[in-house]
């Protein structure tokens, strides 16, 4: 067996010897045939939907005719010819449309193709179970990304019979993708104009269940099923997402925090890190020091003075350095905390990041819990870039805060000392650059509970220099 580098060298030598001065389809096909022979097997993708693993001996090229695994196609064009991948445009007999055939050496697919293969296999595995459950035949399968309607390629869609539609999500997807099927189902329902069944992986429905309990209109507009890898069963609305409130006590580190912040008082910001029982000192959202009662650590190294000088050059508005684009939401959070009283009438001495905590959840959104001067809880969700799931992610946080507010968990665990928390629903505030609210934002917000107090704040796109409120929709109080 030739090693990959020697194979590539051999292929390039053969290709160089065969390459004519002008393009010649016959020579191009011969190059293709030789390249196929250099590998023991190939994985073939047909239009990104069907995947076949075929031995090289089972692939034949006769003139412009291509045969493999029981398929026969006429080669129209060899669009890309590389040592480990080939893309061919070909047409079946009596067909007017061409297929795109992608050949990948061996059984290992590049990441996008492997992802597509996994999702395709999942979609196919659902077909028999859907037919049994709905009592009708699946007539169409759809997997492509529908950007026009905001439905990603992570959500297989199927049509069944004349009046039913299905949308599902693979158990192997990340948590935000699984939870996003609720939003995708709403958009799919508007497109397909049929009764939609939503299939959720068994054991991964806690967040969706919590949302549906709070959103009866959505719960009743769809049929909800769970998939255990073999069968479909009705979704049970019993166990929602698990959250908890960590005890909070301000660590006795004032002197050390003051010493570090004095190095660059206009640039460094102390923020409580409740899980570590420490104070996190940040430069435009990046942690440069962590102070607890036992020690001070420096995640980016020390001494701090040259580090801060370097960060000030690289992580600044208008910079093209990668550090200027890293962790932008943390930067926006930092600017918002620094100007909080200019944006919202809340207490600066009672701002808690990531409270309460979500057990086992992947939350890629920044949450702040604070309180108004007169004791009303305020939940702040921050997004620096467009995210179609923002309304429902914000709902998750608000539901958790409300559950713990009603139970008195915040006061019991040391939050808001000396402040009387009003027995009223928390106000939900969503903050993002005005042009970064997704076009579906208004439509999804309309599904939120009518009793939820909501405030949308759109800030300027140049928030890295200075935050300015361009839109304030809703009421605080």
Task: Label the predicted regions.
Residues 2-477:
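Charged, terminal alpha-helix-loop-beta segments
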């Amino acid at each position: 067996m030739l090693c990959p580098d020697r194979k590539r060298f051999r292929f390039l030598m053969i290709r160089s010897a065969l390459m004519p001065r002008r393009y010649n389809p016959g020579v191009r096909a011969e190059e293709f045939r030789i390249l196929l022979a250099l590998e023991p097997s190939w994985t073939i993708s047909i239009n990104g939907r069907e995947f076949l693993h075929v031995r090289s001996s089972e692939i034949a090229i006769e003139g412009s005719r291509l045969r493999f695994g029981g398929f026969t196609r006429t080669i129209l064009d060899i669009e890309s010819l590389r040592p480990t991948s080939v893309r061919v445009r070909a047409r079946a007999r009596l067909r007017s449309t061409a297929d795109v055939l992608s050949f990948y050496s061996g059984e290992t697919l590049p990441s996008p193709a492997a992802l597509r293969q996994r999702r395709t296999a999942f979609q196919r595995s659902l077909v028999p179970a859907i037919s049994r459950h709905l009592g009708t035949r699946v007539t169409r399968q759809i997997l492509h990304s529908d950007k026009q309607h905001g439905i990603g390629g992570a959500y297989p869609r199927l049509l069944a019979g004349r009046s039913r539609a299905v949308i599902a999500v693979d158990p192997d997807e990340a948590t935000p993708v699984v939870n996003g099927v609720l939003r995708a189902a709403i958009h799919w329902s508007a497109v397909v104009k049929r009764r939609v069944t939503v299939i959720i992986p068994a054991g991964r429905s806690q967040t969706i269940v919590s949302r549906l309990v709070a959103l009866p209109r959505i719960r009743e507009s769809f049929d909800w099923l769970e998939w255990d890898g073999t069968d479909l069963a009705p979704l049970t609305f019993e166990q929602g997402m698990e959250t908890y409130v960590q005890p909070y006590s301000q660590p006795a580190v004032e002197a050390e925090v003051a010493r570090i912040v004095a190095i660059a008082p206009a640039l460094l910001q102390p923020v409580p890190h409740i899980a570590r029982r420490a104070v996190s000192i940040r430069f435009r959202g990046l942690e440069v020091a962590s102070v607890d009662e036992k020690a001070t650590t420096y995640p980016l190294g020390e001494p701090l003075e040259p580090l801060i000088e370097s960060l000030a050059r690289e992580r600044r508005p208008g910079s093209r350095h990668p550090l200027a684009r890293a962790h932008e939401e943390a930067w926006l959070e930092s600017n918002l905390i620094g100007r909080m009283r200019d944006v919202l009438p809340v207490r600066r001495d009672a701002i808690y990041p990531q409270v309460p905590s979500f057990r086992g959840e992947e939350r890629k959104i920044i949450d702040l819990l604070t309180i108004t001067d007169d004791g009303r809880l305020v939940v702040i969700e921050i997004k620096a870039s467009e995210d179609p799931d923002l309304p429902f992610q914000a709902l998750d946080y608000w539901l958790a805060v409300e559950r713990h507010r009603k139970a008195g968990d915040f006061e019991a665990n040391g939050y808001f000392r000396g402040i009387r928390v009003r027995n009223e629903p928390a106000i939900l505030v969503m903050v993002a650059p005005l042009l970064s609210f997704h076009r579906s934002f208004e439509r999804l917000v309309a599904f939120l509970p009518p009793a939820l107090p909501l405030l949308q704040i759109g800030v300027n796109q140049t928030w890295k220099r200075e935050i300015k409120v361009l839109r304030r929709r809703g009421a605080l109080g």
